């Protein structure tokens, strides 16, 4: 159960970071191009880790709720 909460929390954090990056890209079109490459690599790594987890988390939530 604890791992479910951890996965869900990490997924939400990742989504919020991506939304923030998209909002910044809209308001400042050159912001992503000027972003620190290390930050972008960290985002890519987090994405690679979390994307396979998201469907599993969604299924577990469906099982708990319904």
Curated annotation (Swiss-Prot):
Coiled coil: none annotated. Expressed by the venom gland. Residues 1-25 form the signal peptide. Its main location: secreted. It comes from the Eukaryota. It is found in: Secreted. GO terms for molecular function: toxin activity. Toxin that causes a rapid and irreversible paralysis when intrathoracically injected into insects (blowflies). Does not cause spontaneous nocifensive behaviors by intraplantar injection in mice. Exhibits hemolytic and cytotoxic activities on HEK293 cells. This is Myrmicitoxin(1)-Pr5a.
